[in-house]
Amino acid sequence: PRSTQGLSSAASDVYKRQNLEFKKKYNSKILGSHADRNRIPGIDILLEENQKHKIGNLEFEVIFIPGHTKGHIAFFFKKEKIAFTGDTLFSLGCGRVFEGTHEEMFNSLNKIKNLPPDTKIYCGHEYTNSNLNFCLKYDPKNTHLKDKKINIEKKLNSNQPTIPSTIADEIKTNIF
């Protein structure tokens, strides 16, 4: 099956370019934040906070999470227990505050934190190993973090991805 819709979480230059390439290559619709309607070229379907949308048999809810960018959104697939958090929450870290405020970022991270603990987190970038070293520097006695380091090293040595993480794991190990 081919992709008929692409999800866009933020108005970053990389994502803007990728959205247009995806749209052209797959003749697909792009879904993005209503707040970014004038900033992301090619958005066909505008999404707002708490809105539910279906792609095939999959339904997701839109979570408005400004901070990294003004119109940043996440996609929460409740039935599948999966959240795509873009550049707001990473495994063991969080995105930079480029356009929003630190208060917005803090509130957005708390929204994500309140998802069910077993929710799998898929982030926009893979910075897990460098984020791990940062967290260990500031929380060196965290036994959960030490265990996660062993797990991450095993995965990396086996050429396995370190993503997804879970909400429960991030609460125990992510200093943000």
Kindly label every feature range from the protein language model.
Residues I40-D139:
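Catalytic core of the metallo-beta-lactamase
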Residues Y26-S28, T119:
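A short helix->loop->beta-strand "cap" motif at the edges of active sites that frequently abuts
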Residues P1-Y15:
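Short, small-residue-biased leader/transition segments that mark boundaries at the very start
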Residues N110-K120, N129-F176:
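Accessory terminal helices/loops
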Residues S28-A35:
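Short internal beta-strands
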Residues K16-K25, G42-I43:
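Metal-dependent catalytic neighborhoods of phosphoester/phosphodiester hydrolases
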